[in-house]
């Protein structure tokens, strides 16, 4: 029987984070399910089982936008080259099969935040280059 190839994408894996606990539990639960388990990450700090394939994807970064954009491009290129059957991402990367919006929708969060800010600060927040990048990535998904 053919193994389905699953890739889980998490930019940075630290064992103490919420999304990371989700990833770890999912990998453990899926270990005996006739799946090839792959993780695409910039950095892995946790324990791993022998049947997990950790793919380190660590492009250069100069700031928040280049960190997000660089990882998104590199991760997508890797999963396309590897031809995984299912790609589940915890990052806002267009082209994944399943997206876990653990942080919610960024635009909704920004709108909630602007409610408590002076008008000039709210406008600056909504026009910030990083926040515009994140909202655009969500739109592309």
Regions inferred by a protein language model and the residue ranges of each:
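N-terminal strand-loop element at the rim of the active site
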Residues: 3, 10-16, 29-66
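Flexible, active-site-proximal loop/turn residues at the rims of small-molecule/cofactor binding pockets
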Residues: 12-13, 93, 105
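Acceptor-binding helix/loop patch of EC 2.4 sugar-transfer enzymes
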Residues: 98-137, 141
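Receiver (REC) domain switch-region micro-motif
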Residues: 6, 87, 99
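An amphipathic, basic-hydrophobic alpha-helix
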Residues: 61-87, 96, 131-137
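Short His-centered aromatic/hydrophobic patch
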Residues: 89-93, 101
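Conserved alpha-helical elements of sugar-nucleotide-dependent glycosyltransferases
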Residues: 18-25
């Amino acid at each position: 029987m053919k193994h389905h190839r699953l890739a889980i994408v998490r930019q940075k894996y630290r064992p103490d984070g919420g999304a990371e606990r989700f990833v770890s539990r999912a990998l453990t639960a899926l270990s005996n399910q006739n799946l090839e388990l792959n993780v695409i990450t910039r950095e892995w700090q946790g324990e791993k089982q022998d049947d997990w394939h950790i793919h380190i994807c660590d492009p250069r970064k100069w700031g928040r936008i280049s960190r997000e954009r660089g990882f998104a491009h590199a991760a997508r290129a890797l999963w396309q080259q590897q031809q995984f059957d299912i790609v589940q991402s915890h990052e806002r990367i267009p082209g994944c099969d399943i997206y876990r919006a653990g942080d919610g929708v960024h635009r909704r969060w920004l709108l909630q935040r602007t409610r408590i800010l002076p008008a000039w600060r709210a406008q600056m927040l909504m026009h910030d280059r990083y926040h515009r990048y994140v909202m655009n990535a969500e739109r592309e998904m």
